[in-house]
Amino acid sequence: MPPKRIAKRRSPPEDAIPKSKKVKVSHRSHKTEPGLVLTLGQGDVGQLGLGESVLERKKPALVPLLQDVVQAEAGGMHTVCLNQSGQVYSFGCNDEGALGRDTSVEGSEMVPGKVELQEKVVQVSAGDSHTAALTEDGRVFLWGSFRDNNGVIGLLEPMKKSMVPVQVQLDMPVVKVASGNDHLVMLTTDGDLYTLGCGEQGQLGRVPELFANRGGRQGLERLLVPKCVLLKSRGSRGRVRFQDAFCGAYLTFAISREGHVYGFGLSNYHQLGTPGTASCFIPQNLTSFKNSTKSWVGFSGGQHHTICMDSEGKAYSLGRAEYGRLGLGEGAEEKSIPTLISRLPVVSSVACGASVGYAVSKDGRVFAWGMGTNYQLGTGQDEDAWSPVEMTGKQLENRVVLTVSSGGQHTVLLVKDKEQS
């Protein structure tokens, strides 16, 4: 009897294969500890979330209606909060669509309102007039608009802003989103960096200076269609893969899987840690961050300064020094390398506003320094602080601070009651 012929399995047609399996993405930057939201500073467009009658707070104030918040981010003139169940709330300026929701009812932008998203969100980021949300399966939704020096350039399509969330088209699941003033950085599961938005200062890391102004001949698509930042790996045939990425106002920092720090964007006050002050349009391996004894774990950039931290919980600053924004004491001058902020306890996170700096200590206190004009320091005064000052206030009593985020004129704290910790 002849042997039975085993029928060869026909491979399914290409389009029948699901493009990407449903994955649950995770990254160490995703926050899970729930808390309450406090805001302070200037709130003339509703970015404090305290209603139409409160346009300024010199001390942290509790934002009503928000509970179990795991992430609170300050954009330029708006605030975005993510709660434990993956829902997004926003408040503040909605002129360009940064809130992602209808605010036609007068005053509705001044209090927290829900952004309609069907998916569970695990991370949010906010820029000057845009907001991004990362879902648990690695998709990114975006709303608002990006601007350059001449005005609006669009969001995902030239000159078109979006008042509601739209999905960013990418083939690869994203694990982290980070926003500069007018650019977005997405880190994928594969360790690739995709960037979009304004590229004038080099912050996209993939658009040469020649085309940085509105994309050259290719037009705005060159800037607004997310593309990968390609960087050849020395000594091997592949490309550099990244484990983390952070944004300043006009710059981007990325940490490779080997632990090297790369940066691109504006460095007119050495805020990238470059020896010169030229903008960097392609990723630079930043030798000023090379030190065999420590690894860098956090970066935050203001308008012209950077605050960063190492794995030992020490905070450093570099860049422009005016108004005390480096936290290095009275009379400190501009720094081109990370310089230790010695008057701080062990820190768990750092943050920047436009001209201010913050550090949250391991024991849950928050320290602030820099320009006092907008009451963002929580001292109750409008004087500048050249060294870190511990923030105090009624709403901080018997509470620990989880995180801090700061925008152009306002600051947002995530706190929880001491009993729970």
UniProtKB/Swiss-Prot annotation:
Principal location class: nucleus
Region (Disordered): 1-31
Keyword DNA-binding: yes
SUPFAM superfamilies: RCC1/BLIP-II (SSF50985)
GO biological process: cell division; chromosome segregation; spindle assembly
Positions of post-translational N-methylproline modification: 2
Gene Ontology molecular function terms on file: guanyl-nucleotide exchange factor activity; nucleosomal DNA binding
Gene3D superfamilies from the UniProt entry: Regulator of chromosome condensation 1/beta-lactamase-inhibitor protein II
Basic residues: compositionally biased ranges: 1-10, 19-30
Keywords (A to Z) from UniProt: Cell cycle, Cell division, Chromosome, Cytoplasm, DNA-binding, Guanine-nucleotide releasing factor, Methylation, Mitosis, Nucleus, Phosphoprotein, Repeat
Record has DNA-binding as a keyword: yes
Localization in the cell: Nucleus; Chromosome; Cytoplasm
Positions of post-translational N,N-dimethylproline modification: 2
Modification after translation, per record: N-terminal methylation by METTL11A/NTM1 is required for binding double-stranded DNA and stable chromatin association. Dimethylation produces a permanent positive charge on the amino group, which facilitates electrostatic binding to the phosphate groups on DNA, while inhibiting histone-binding. Methylated tail helps retain RCC1 on chromosomes during nucleotide exchange on Ran.
Assembly, per entry: Interacts with RAN. Interacts with KPNA3. Interacts (via N-terminus and RCC1 repeats) with KPNA4. Interacts with ARRB2; the interaction is detected in the nucleus upon OR1D2 stimulation.
The protein's name: Regulator of chromosome condensation
Organism listed in the record: Mesocricetus auratus
Name of the encoding gene: RCC1
